[in-house]
A protein has these predicted regions:
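Metal-dependent peptidase/peptidase-like ectodomains
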Residues: 7-106
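His/Asp/Glu-rich mid-to-C-terminal helical/loop segments that flank catalytic regions of hydrolases
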Residues: 1, 105-139
Length: 139
């Protein structure tokens, strides 16, 4: 398992694009990529942007969430190309972008007020629990 922080997202995804072109591990060996950008908010619905390859296992996320009730709903969207999972999705890596938009902290995202003090961490535990449960069941 790798935890990777990319630089250059707001400059055309330069960091993630470079890594996707020069991976430490061959991309076809990545079982699933999780993009956890912008999850510090309190909306009870979790926004999920899912790659085409990621859709093969996405029903498992829905099943786990239905069983455990981590979020009111998983609000699935098509790829938008505006975050670091996108260069991997274009290369057929299964991935999901979790973003908690529309809560009380969303108005601060990508502004000078996007600070620790204005972040809301209530959705961290359910997000990570959902991911841990998913990984433990992934075939």
């Amino acid at each position: 398992m790798y935890f990777i922080a990319f630089s250059g997202e707001d400059a055309n995804l330069r960091g993630s694009e470079w890594y996707a072109e020069h991976p430490l591990t061959p991309l076809d060996q990545i079982k699933y990529l999780f993009n956890l950008d912008m999850i510090a908010d309190n909306n009870p619905a979790q926004y999920c942007e899912v790659s085409n390859e990621g859709m093969k296992q996405y029903p498992l996320f829905e099943k786990i969430n239905a069983e455990k009730g981590y979020f009111k709903e998983l609000d699935r969207h098509e790829l938008d190309g505006n975050s670091d999972h996108y260069p991997f999705a274009l290369r057929n890596v299964p991935c999901i972008f979790f973003m908690n938009e529309g809560g009380d902290a969303f108005k601060y995202y990508h502004t000078i007020y996007d600070t620790w003090e204005n972040s809301i961490f209530g959705n961290y535990e359910p997000t990570f629990s959902l991911i841990i449960d998913f990984i433990s069941r992934l075939q």
